Amino acid sequence: MSAAFDPSSYATQLDAKVARLRELLAPFGAPEPAVFDSPREHYRLRAEFRLWREDGQRHYAMFAPGEKHKAILIDDFPIASERINALMPRLKAAWQASEELGNRLFQVEFLTTLAGDAMITMCYHRPLDEAWEVEARQLAEALGVSVIGRSKGKRLVIGRDYAVEKLDVAGRVFSYRQPEGAFTQPNGAVNQKMLSWAFEAMGDREDDLLELYCGNGNFTLPLATRVRQVLATEISKTSVNAALSNLDENAVDNVRLVRLSAEELTQALNEVRPFRRLEGIDLKSYQFGTVFVDPPRAGMDPDTCELTRRFERILYISCNPETLAANIAQLQDTHRIERCALFDQFPYTHHMESGVLLVRR
């Protein structure tokens, strides 16, 4: 279910989301949510397009859900960043003018940042060779972007394989590497508001933070400045490497990062079994006051939910309010909602990002 892109109806659509969140959190005595709106257009920093052949040319195409064989041809994409919209016609002209760039090209992906960086991934149904690389290098230079070529089992990088983002949280600017193919928050303006809300909700602490699902360190960097130490977990190798680079780049030195699932971490904390990946980390030396979770759409599984119960404070960012409500229902006998927020990451859709701070009763 998606609403049409219509900036004039934005306020009405946002009101409906706020009402939905209120309704889901009402059984738990939640306070009124803080609401963080989105730019009305050009808010999406990444976009992926299939290419569709018509009249002997390849065009950017999108598809309605369940309509794989009925392409909607597009020349621009008003929800995408201004940079993506500026790059789209120039990239199209380049692949139309060059056999090397256009031959068997089937998909392109754009990643841009508020800091002005841009990366384009071009996916092919054929092997890429030096001739492609020569033309891709000229393209990258002409457009002022990094270009990545992908074909089965191979990746050629012209420039860098990540984009650089810079986000301001409470007056400090944090720099982030966003690797090609790894998850990043698509709405940069709202992400910045979300980081500021989490920073504020955390407050200045003299104890430690446990973070589950830390990704590239999006929240880790600002939250680490609020606590004594952070133990952060993540299972994606790409994200772990990006997070380590980001910690280093920002000179944040009070974070230990481990590649453990939430389930494995529970076993480690309960001393069920030792983990080699925790070598050199003394879990008993941490004084965890807060756990921060930003789980996938399915929410926390019941065991992870039970793990969070042992903490005084649970700071929870959710991309699915239904599973958030289900998790709060499991925790409500021990924790209450102290503050909550709605972040409109995905305007003109029914999706919403929300945040709650749960505090032990």
Swiss-Prot record:
Keyword Thylakoid: no
InterPro entries, per the entry: MeTrfase_TrmA_AS (IPR030390), MeTrfase_TrmA_CS (IPR030391), SAM-dependent_MTases_sf (IPR029063), TrmA_MeTrfase (IPR011869), U5_MeTrfase_fam (IPR010280)
Residues the record marks as active site: C319 (nucleophile), E353 (proton acceptor)
GO CC terms in record: cytosol
Gene Ontology terms, MF aspect: rRNA binding; tRNA (uracil(54)-C5)-methyltransferase activity, S-adenosyl methionine-dependent; tRNA binding
Annotated binding of S-adenosyl-L-methionine, by residue: Q185, Y213, N218, E234, D294
Enzyme Commission number, as recorded: 2.1.1.-, 2.1.1.35
UniProt key word RNA-binding: no
Domain of life of the source: Bacteria
Gene3D superfamilies xrefs: 2.40.50.1070, Vaccinia Virus protein VP39 (3.40.50.150)
Alphabetic keyword roster: Methyltransferase, S-adenosyl-L-methionine, Transferase, tRNA processing
Enzyme class: transferase
GO BP terms: tRNA methylation
HAMAP family for this protein: RNA_methyltr_TrmA
Chain's role: Dual-specificity methyltransferase that catalyzes the formation of 5-methyluridine at position 54 (m5U54) in all tRNAs, and that of position 341 (m5U341) in tmRNA (transfer-mRNA).
Family membership noted in the UniProt record: Belongs to the class I-like SAM-binding methyltransferase superfamily. RNA M5U methyltransferase family. TrmA subfamily.
Name of the protein: tRNA/tmRNA (uracil-C(5))-methyltransferase
Gene giving rise to this polypeptide: trmA
